[in-house]
């Protein structure tokens, strides 16, 4: 038990346009070098592109994309008696969201479209349809956990 008071998690302010905390978090993941206004422009442009291509609400598509990218299990390295095992562990909900956003942005950055907004929109549309690089990353992580299921009893 810590002797001092445990600091609680800070509440994130919702984004100015859609008043969504999820979108505000996503903007922070996209942001580089503290350029938040640029990150906001990229996100909002990507959501506009998604709205043009699909008739559904773009926030629903973003949520669906993140749902399809969220991992439920991952592997962690655990050293036991001189050898290192990849031990499958369940992922906490906050980390699930963080990983999904990070993987979606990484996959978008590797795409070939002209602007980041178009890349992000393309990756969001792909992920919402259960295809694309970010979904493949989740599948790889799940496959790795499945392959190392034998070491699950080393969990901590």
From Swiss-Prot:
A biological process from GO: translation
Gene3D superfamilies, per the entry: Ribosomal protein S7 domain
Keywords: Ribonucleoprotein, Ribosomal protein, RNA-binding, rRNA-binding, tRNA-binding
GO cellular component, one term: small ribosomal subunit
Family to which the UniProt record says this protein belongs: Belongs to the universal ribosomal protein uS7 family.
PANTHER family to which the protein is assigned, alphabetical: RIBOSOMAL PROTEIN S7 (PTHR11205)
Name of this protein: Small ribosomal subunit protein uS7
Organism listed in the record: Shewanella sp. (strain W3-18-1)
Lineage: Bacteria, Pseudomonadati, Pseudomonadota, Gammaproteobacteria, Alteromonadales
Gene from which this protein is expressed: rpsG
């Amino acid at each position: 038990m810590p002797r001092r008071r445990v600091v609680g998690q800070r509440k994130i302010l919702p984004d100015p346009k859609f008043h969504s905390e999820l979108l505000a978090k996503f903007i922070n993941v996209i942001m580089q070098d503290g350029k938040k206004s640029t990150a906001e422009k990229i996100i909002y442009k990507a959501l506009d592109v998604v709205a043009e291509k699909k008739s559904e609400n773009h926030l629903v598509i973003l949520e669906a994309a993140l749902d399809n990218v969220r991992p439920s299990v991952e592997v962690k390295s655990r050293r036991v008696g001189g050898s290192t095992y990849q031990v499958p562990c369940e992922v906490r909900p906050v980390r699930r969201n963080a990983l999904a956003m990070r993987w979606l942005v990484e996959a978008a950055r590797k795409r070939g479209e002209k602007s980041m907004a178009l890349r992000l929109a393309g990756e969001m549309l792909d992920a919402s349809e259960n295809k694309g690089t970010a979904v493949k990353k989740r599948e790889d992580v799940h496959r790795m956990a499945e392959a190392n299921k034998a070491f699950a009893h080393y969990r901590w």
